Curated annotation (Swiss-Prot):
<feature type="binding site">
    <location>
        <position position="201"/>
    </location>
    <ligand>
        <name>a ubiquinone</name>
    </ligand>
</feature>
<keyword id="KW-0830">Ubiquinone</keyword>
<dbReference type="InterPro" id="IPR016174">
    <property type="entry name" value="Di-haem_cyt_TM"/>
</dbReference>
<keyword id="KW-0679">Respiratory chain</keyword>
<feature type="transmembrane region" description="Helical">
    <location>
        <begin position="320"/>
        <end position="340"/>
    </location>
</feature>
<keyword id="KW-0349">Heme</keyword>
<feature type="binding site" description="axial binding residue">
    <location>
        <position position="196"/>
    </location>
    <ligand>
        <name>heme b b566</name>
    </ligand>
</feature>
<dbReference type="GO" id="GO:0046872">
    <property type="term" value="F:metal ion binding"/>
</dbReference>
<feature type="transmembrane region" description="Helical">
    <location>
        <begin position="226"/>
        <end position="246"/>
    </location>
</feature>
<feature type="binding site" description="axial binding residue">
    <location>
        <position position="97"/>
    </location>
    <ligand>
        <name>heme b b566</name>
    </ligand>
</feature>
<feature type="transmembrane region" description="Helical">
    <location>
        <begin position="288"/>
        <end position="308"/>
    </location>
</feature>
<keyword id="KW-0813">Transport</keyword>
<keyword id="KW-0472">Membrane</keyword>
<dbReference type="GO" id="GO:0006122">
    <property type="term" value="P:mitochondrial electron transport, ubiquinol to cytochrome c"/>
</dbReference>
<feature type="transmembrane region" description="Helical">
    <location>
        <begin position="347"/>
        <end position="367"/>
    </location>
</feature>
<dbReference type="InterPro" id="IPR036150">
    <property type="entry name" value="Cyt_b/b6_C_sf"/>
</dbReference>
<comment type="similarity">
    <text>Belongs to the cytochrome b family.</text>
</comment>
Length: 379
C-alpha cells in the first residue's frame, strides 16, 4: 500500500516541507523564529478577521466601533488586544529573525534573503496602516506625518501625497483605503511567505557553524516539530501575559483620545517597533535626506550579501565581528529609545551619533573587520 503522505499531490507538498524535510542537526533556538512568525501571522489574520466583522471604516464611527468591540462584543477586548499586542510580538520575532540571519550569514542565500526584505517592508506597511484604523489622536497625526514625508519626493511629491490621501488632508477617503489595504496585505504577505519557503527549501537551512551540513541531517519531524511547539508555547504565554495583565503597556495613551485635526499631540511618535527608523528620519535636518535615510535604514539589508568579505560564513568563530554585531544591536536599542524622546538637547545629538554609527558599522566597520579576521587567520 502506498503512503498517502508521499503520493497525494497536496499532502506531498506539506510532507516535504514539514515532515520528511532534511534539516541540519545543530540548529539552535535562533532557528525557531521562522515558525513563530508563521504563528504570529495566523493569529493576526484570525483576530483581524473577527475585528473586521465589527469595525467601520468611517471617520464618524471608527473610534466608536473600536470602543463597541471592547465593551459590547463577546471577548471583543481580548480579540482587539491580541491583535494589537500580536503585532508587537510579530516585530520582536521579525527583528530577531533578521538578526539571526545577519549573525549566522544566512543572507548568502540571496533569493531567500531578498524575499525576506520585501516581506519586512510589507509587514511594516501593514502595521502602519493598522495603527491608523482606531482613529485616535496618534492614529490621525501619525498618518498625517508619515504620509506627508512623500511630499519630499521632487516634482511629484505633493500630487502623490494628495493621491494617497484622496483629498487635501487625511480624512474619510484615507481611512477607508487604509482599511482596504490593511485587510488585503496580510494575504499578500502569506503568499510571499510561501515564496520565501520555496527558495529556502531549494538550498536547505543554514546552521550555526555556517559549514555545509549535508552529511549530518535529521528529519524535521519529530525533532524540530517538537522544538517549534515549545517555542509556540513560550511565545503564546508571553503574549497572553501581556494581553491579560498590561494590554496598553506598548500603546500610546493619546490614541484613547478621538482624532482631532485642530489639536496636535505634544509628541507625535509611531509604535515602538518603528522608533529606530523614526529616530534616523529625525536625525537629519533636511526633509528629503531624512526620508532617504529612513528608507535606506531598512533597504541597507539588501546590500549586506555584497559586503560579506569574510572567508567564513557564520560569526560563530569570529570574535571581532561578534563585538561589532552586538555594538550594532546596542545602537539599535539607543535609536529606539531616542525615537520616543522629544526633539531637544541632548537627544538630538545622541540620535545623530547613533544614526551615523548604524550606517558606519554595516557599511564600513563590518567588512573591514572581516578582512582583518581573514588576515589574522592567514587566509
Amino acid at each position: 500500500m502506498t503512503n498517502i503522505r508521499k503520493t497525494h499531490p497536496l499532502v506531498k507538498i506539506i510532507n516535504n516541507s514539514l515532515v520528511d524535510l532534511p534539516a541540519p542537526s545543530s540548529l539552535s533556538a535562533w532557528w525557531n523564529f521562522g515558525s513563530l512568525l508563521g504563528v504570529c501571522l495566523a493569529v493576526q489574520i484570525l483576530t483581524g478577521l473577527f475585528l473586521a466583522m465589527h469595525y467601520t471604516s468611517d471617520t464618524a464611527t471608527a473610534f466608536n466601533s473600536v470602543t463597541h468591540i471592547c465593551r459590547d462584543v463577546n471577548y471583543g477586548w481580548l480579540i482587539r488586544y491580541l491583535h494589537a499586542n500580536g503585532a508587537s510580538m510579530f516585530f520582536i520575532c521579525l527583528y530577531l529573525h533578521v538578526g539571526r540571519g545577519m549573525y549566522y550569514g544566512s543572507y548568502t542565500y540571496s533569493e531567500t534573503w531578498n524575499v525576506g526584505i520585501i516581506l519586512l517592508f510589507a509587514v511594516m506597511a501593514t502595521a502602519f496602516m493598522g495603527y491608523v484604523l482606531p482613529w485616535g489622536q496618534m492614529s490621525f497625526w501619525g498618518a498625517t506625518v508619515i504620509t506627508n514625508l512623500l511630499s519630499a519626493i521632487p516634482y511629484i511629491g505633493t500630487d502623490l501625497v494628495q493621491w494617497i490621501w484622496g483629498g487635501f488632508s487625511v480624512d474619510k477617503a484615507t481611512l477607508t483605503r487604509f482599511f482596504a489595504f490593511h485587510f488585503l496585505l496580510p494575504f499578500i504577505v502569506t503568499a510571499l511567505v510561501m515564496v520565501h519557503l520555496l527558495f529556502l527549501h531549494e538550498t536547505g537551512s543554514n546552521n550555526p557553524t555556517g559549514i555545509p551540513s549535508d552529511s549530518d541531517m535529521i528529519p524535521f519531524h519529530p525533532y524540530y516539530t517538537i522544538k517549534d511547539m515549545l517555542g509556540f508555547l513560550i511565545m503564546l504565554a508571553a503574549l497572553s501575559t501581556l494581553v491579560l495583565f498590561s494590554p496598553d503597556l506598548l500603546g500610546d495613551p493619546d490614541n484613547y483620545i478621538p482624532a482631532n485635526p485642530l489639536n496636535t499631540p505634544p509628541h507625535i511618535k509611531p509604535e515602538w517597533y518603528f522608533l529606530f527608523a523614526y529616530a534616523i528620519l529625525r536625525s537629519i535636518p533636511n526633509k528629503l535626506g531624512g526620508v532617504l535615510a529612513l528608507v535606506l535604514s531598512i533597504l541597507i539589508l539588501a546590500i549586506i550579501p555584497l559586503l560579506h568579505t569574510s572567508k567564513q560564513r557564520s560569526m560563530m568563530f569570529r570574535p571581532l565581528s561578534q563585538c561589532l554585531f552586538w555594538l550594532l544591536v546596542a545602537v539599535l536599542f539607543t535609536l529606539t529609545w531616542i525615537g520616543g524622546q522629544p526633539v531637544e538637547y541632548p537627544f538630538i545629538i545622541i540620535g545623530q551619533t547613533a544614526s551615523v554609527l548604524y550606517f558606519l558599522i554595516i557599511l564600513v566597520f563590518m567588512p573591514l573587520t572581516s578582512l582583518i579576521e581573514n588576515h589574522l587567520m592567514k587566509w
